[in-house]
Amino acid sequence: MQENFILKNGKRVLIRDIVPDDYDAMQTYWQALATETIFTNQYVGRKPRSKESFDKQCDNPYLWGVGVFDGDKIVGACQCFVFHPEHLWCGYTAQFGIHMLEAVQSMGLGRHLMTLMENWCVSQGMERIEGSVRTQNHKAISLYLKCGYEIEGLSKRKALIDGVWHDEYRIAKLLNNVRA
């Protein structure tokens, strides 16, 4: 998958599949993301994922992942994976994560990435997409609600950040895609 996308400010970025050669760029991206926000699971000083683990993830047929590139620099990403792909009863649920640097937030990119991700889920026969979002992340919550996601529950004390507990909403969208 590869396509150009024009942000609301007129800047052009490239959205494409993450591949094993993107390992170093992803490590740089994770570090930059960790300095900008507490709304992801990235934090300053986190040990980098191994190259072997990254390569394995890139080759997983049950995982969809794209990066948003500004030149050679990754400025955003979206991933989605089938939670239990081989399970007869539960193989219709996908989990997602989306994140981007502040410079490209509120530029129409999030909604577009969500649409691409949902299209992949439909092509995989998914019925449900789910994720979590920190309750203070108002931009993301607004995006998810606009995209048709619902808040299904609250996970209390999900993350302890700088001595403060943070709750997370559990969110989901039903795709009505299952073949009966």
How should these model regions be labeled?
Residues 45-103, 114, 174-177:
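Acetyl-CoA-dependent GNAT
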Residues 36-44:
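A short gly/proline-enriched turn/hairpin at secondary-structure junctions
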Residues 1-8, 161-180:
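Terminal substrate-recognition subdomain of acyl/acetyltransferases
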Residues 130-133, 145, 150-166:
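Conserved catalytic-core motifs of GNAT/GCN5-like acyltransferases
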Residues 12-26:
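A short beta-loop-alpha structural element at the N-terminal edge
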Residues 106-119, 123, 142-146:
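Conserved acetyl-CoA-binding loop-helix of GNAT-fold acetyltransferases
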Residues 114, 137-140, 157-162:
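Short glycine/proline-centered loop/turn elements that form peptide/ligand docking sites
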Residues 11-13, 72-77, 166:
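Glycine-rich phosphate/pyrophosphate-binding loop shared by adenosine-nucleotide-utilizing enzymes
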